[in-house]
Structures are given as C-alpha cells and as structure tokens.
C-alpha cells in the first residue's frame, strides 16, 4: 500500500533525484504512517546509514511543502525481520545455531513456471519427492543465478513436509552451513553441529560453489554426505556450474555430487518468459496484457529475477505517473533502464573500469599483484557478477583465465566493504551507478 502523503513525496523525489538514485535508495524503502509519524524501514544497515546521512533532510523539506501546517515526524529503522536475523547469527552459547533451516512456503511446485528450459529440472525435482529408495540420490541442479534453482529446492522441501511434517527437512545456503560450522568450532560445540546435520532426513544445500577452497568445511560436508547417503536420506545440491567445473572442490566431493542425477537449468525461452510475467502480474495484482508481457519478454531474456525486477519497476512507475501499463509506457521505461545496460558485457566493464583508474586492460587481466591493479580488478570482477549473467568461472576466464575462487574472493571482499566507509567501495558504488544508470 502507498500512503497518499508518501505517494506525493515519492513524486517529488522522482523529480529531484536521478533515476539511478531513486531506484537504488528510495524504491527499496518500506513505509507505514501512524499518528502523523512516517516510519521508514530500510532493508539493511548500509541503506539505513545512507538514508540518514543523505536523504532525511530532503524528506523533511518535501513533507514540509506538502503539509506545512502539520508536517509529519520521520522515524527510520532497519526492517524488523532483517534485524532479527542479523542478531541471531551472532548469538553464541545456549542458542540454536542452525539458522536458515526453514522452508519458504512461498515456493511450491504449482507456482513454478515450466518451460523447455527447465522442464527436466522440474520433473526430476518432483519425482525426487516420491520417496523411492532406489531413485537418484543426490539430485544436483546447476545453472546461472535467477533461473529457479532455489525455488525448486524449497518446493522439494515443502512437498516432503506435506507428506510428513515430522520429517527433518533442512534448506540451507552453503555460506550459512560454513558459518554454522565456524561458530560451532568457536563455541566448542562441533559435536552438536555434526549430530544435527547427520540426523537430517532431507538436506537441501544451495550454491555449493561457496565451499570452494574451504578445506575443513569440505571435509565436514564430505562426512555429512557419506552419513546421509549411507542412511538412504535425501540430498539435493545446487551450483552455478556443472560439478566437474567447480574449482577449489576436492575430487572426492565432485565424484559424490555426480553419484545421482545432474540436471541443468537454462535461461527461459520466449514462451516461458511470457508465462512468468503474466503469472507474476497475476500474483501482484498488476493489470498486464499478453501483448505487453510479450514485448517485455522479447527485451529481457537473461533470467527470472530480472523479469520480476523490471515488472516491479513498471508497476511502481505506472502508479506514480497514473498511467496504464501499455507498450508505449513500457518502451519509455525500458529505454531508460537499458540505455547503458543493454551494451554491458565483461569487455565493456573492463574498459570502463580501466579508464576510471587510468590503467590498461592488459594489466587488469594479467597476473600483476600491485594494489593499483588488484583493486580495480576486484571491482571489475564484482561489477561483472552483478551486472551480467556470467558465472564466477566464466568471469575468471575473461580476466586472464583466472580461477573461479579468485572471482569469488573479489566478490565477497567488495561486498564486505559495505560496512566500512572505504575509498574502494565508494569507487565501486560510483562505477555501479554509472553502468547501471
């Protein structure tokens, strides 16, 4: 729901700010109004600090113009759910350390949009829940970001729980599995950790590539895998590429990943993209005609997540501009969004970053380790991951045949700098905004 006062404020902000600023900092905010107080909720701490520093005074000035007689007070908080999760992660003793194990009920088989690109993955996932003892185990799904791997993991979990609510069905992202193990070692509770994960009925482990070059974590995963497999418990794994091509993973683990059935999920074809858009429009009560959905689907083709993001932008801007969603409106919006982004590929990103830092592309893709080269290289790798559909392995290849783990390390390092006000992260944000404008 968009409150009338906040809607007026958004219109003024849209005029005052650049499209990049508006979509990057304002659109993610959630707002409620009570007793003449506007409660603004940010999705994370970084945006919270940025809004307080850069935009609170702008909000106040606009609201004073809108309701000069009695302007509302503004209170900014981090969205409650996110805050609670963050607190839980750092609690130590006597607290359940195994987080992120809940299955998301939103993701079911019935609302997974099937098409030629994902039909085999869908069928295999559904068949996996039939609980046939001799059926393929593990099931390994791989493909680029935003194609539905996580949706299928949760759908599998939900199906098992519908059959038997007492089953111990655990969904967890690989990074959280690793973090839980580290916390257990720190808290001298590693036996508890082992007992927990080795007593699972169904393990749904997302983004297995995050185990890359983590020797102890891989040992624990190896032992957990063997225990569950020998007990004929179910295992489903996902990754961004075929098991054989995940660098930094032991051959023992790779061979086990391939013991069952390995299925790829590909980017959706045109018909599936249209179906996804119409389904998402129906779910979100957006009036979207088939012709408009087809037009969008022809322009956006990388993944489901991008389709959803574009649809949300179109919905918000149609509300703000009080216009129906027509092909002409969509053309205007897509032209703005895609003006620079349409030509974005890894080579283009390398050119822009090299020019910004006044270095040569040949240096960026070389083996040079000086800070003047390493930082631009890490920024360029992270931009490539965020702004293109390429996997870590493919990005590594484009940067002088570097290992998948080098790209993963760069990506994590740049993202960790969000918490610190560093010059490197400022450079990254500036370049991201320039490329994504």
From Swiss-Prot:
GO molecular function: ATP binding; ATP hydrolysis activity; DNA replication origin binding; lipid binding
Location of the region described as Domain I, interacts with DnaA modulators in the Swiss-Prot/TrEMBL record: 1-82
Chain segments carrying region Domain IV, binds dsDNA: 319-437
Protein name from the UniProt record: Chromosomal replication initiator protein DnaA
Description of how the protein assembles with itself and partners: Oligomerizes as a right-handed, spiral filament on DNA at oriC.
Localization per Swiss-Prot or TrEMBL: Cytoplasm
InterPro entries in the cross-refs: AAA+_ATPase, Chromosome_initiator_DnaA, Chromosome_initiator_DnaA-like, Chromosome_initiator_DnaA_CS, DnaA_C, DnaA_dom, DnaA_N_dom, DnaA_N_sf
Magnesium as UniProt keyword: no
Domain notes: Domain I is involved in oligomerization and binding regulators, domain II is flexibile and of varying length in different bacteria, domain III forms the AAA+ region, while domain IV binds dsDNA.
Record has Oxidoreductase as a keyword: no
Pfam families linked: Bac_DnaA (PF00308), Bac_DnaA_C (PF08299), DnaA_N (PF11638), Hda_lid (PF22688)
Recorded family membership: Belongs to the DnaA family.
Primary role: Plays an essential role in the initiation and regulation of chromosomal replication. ATP-DnaA binds to the origin of replication (oriC) to initiate formation of the DNA replication initiation complex once per cell cycle. Binds the DnaA box (a 9 base pair repeat at the origin) and separates the double-stranded (ds)DNA. Forms a right-handed helical filament on oriC DNA; dsDNA binds to the exterior of the filament while single-stranded (ss)DNA is stabiized in the filament's interior.
Domain II: annotated span: 82-101
Region (Domain III, AAA+ region): 102-318
Leader sequence residues: none
A GO BP entry: DNA replication initiation
Keywords: ATP-binding, Cytoplasm, DNA replication, DNA-binding, Lipid-binding, Nucleotide-binding
Organism: Buchnera aphidicola subsp. Cinara cedri (strain Cc)
Sites where the protein binds ATP: 146, 148-150
């Amino acid at each position: 729901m968009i409150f009338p006062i906040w809607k007026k404020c958004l219109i003024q902000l849209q005029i005052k700010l650049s499209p990049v600023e508006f979509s990057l900092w304002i659109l993610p905010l959630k707002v409620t109004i009570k007793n003449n107080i506007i409660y603004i909720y940010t999705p994370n701490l970084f945006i919270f600090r940025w809004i307080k520093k850069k935009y609170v005074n702008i909000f106040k000035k606009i609201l004073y113009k809108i309701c000069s007689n009695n302007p509302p007070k503004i209170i900014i908080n981090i969205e409650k759910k996110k805050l609670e999760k963050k607190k839980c992660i750092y609690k130590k003793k006597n607290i359940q350390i195994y987080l992120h194990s809940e299955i998301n009920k939103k993701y079911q088989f019935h609302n997974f949009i099937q098409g030629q690109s994902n039909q085999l993955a869908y069928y295999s996932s559904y068949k996996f829940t039939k609980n046939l003892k001799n059926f393929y185990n593990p099931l390994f799904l791989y493909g680029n970001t935003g194609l539905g791997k996580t949706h299928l993991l949760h759908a599998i979990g939900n199906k098992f729980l519908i059959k038997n609510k007492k089953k111990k069905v655990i969904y967890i992202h690989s990074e959280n599995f690793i973090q839980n193990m580290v916390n257990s070692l720190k808290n001298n509770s590693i036996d508890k950790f082992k007992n927990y994960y080795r007593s699972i009925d169904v393990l749904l482990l997302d983004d297995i590539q995050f185990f890359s070059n983590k020797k102890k974590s891989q040992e624990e995963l190896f032992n957990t895998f063997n225990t569950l497999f020998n007990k004929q418990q179910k295992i489903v794994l996902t990754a961004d590429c075929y098991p054989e091509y995940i660098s930094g993973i032991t051959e023992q683990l790779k061979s086990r990943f391939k013991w069952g059935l390995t299925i790829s999920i590909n980017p959706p074809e045109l018909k599936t993209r249209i179906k996804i858009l119409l389904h998402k429009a129906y779910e979100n009560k957006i009036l979207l005609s088939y012709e408009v959905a087809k037009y969008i689907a022809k322009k956006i083709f990388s993944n489901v997540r991008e389709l959803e993001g574009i649809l949300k932008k179109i919905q918000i801007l149609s509300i703000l501009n009080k216009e129906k969603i027509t092909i002409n409106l969509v053309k205007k919006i897509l032209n703005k969004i895609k003006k620079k982004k349409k030509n974005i590929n890894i080579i283009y990103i390398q050119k822009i970053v090299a020019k910004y830092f006044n270095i040569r592309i040949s240096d960026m893709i070389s083996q040079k380790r000086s800070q003047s080269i390493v930082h631009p290289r890490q920024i360029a790798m992270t931009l490539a991951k965020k702004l293109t559909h390429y996997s870590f392995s493919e990005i590594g290849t484009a940067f002088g045949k570097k290992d998948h783990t080098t790209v993963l390390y760069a990506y994590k390092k740049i993202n960790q700098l969000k918490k610190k006000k560093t010059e490197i992260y400022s450079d990254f944000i500036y370049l991201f905004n320039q490329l994504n404008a």
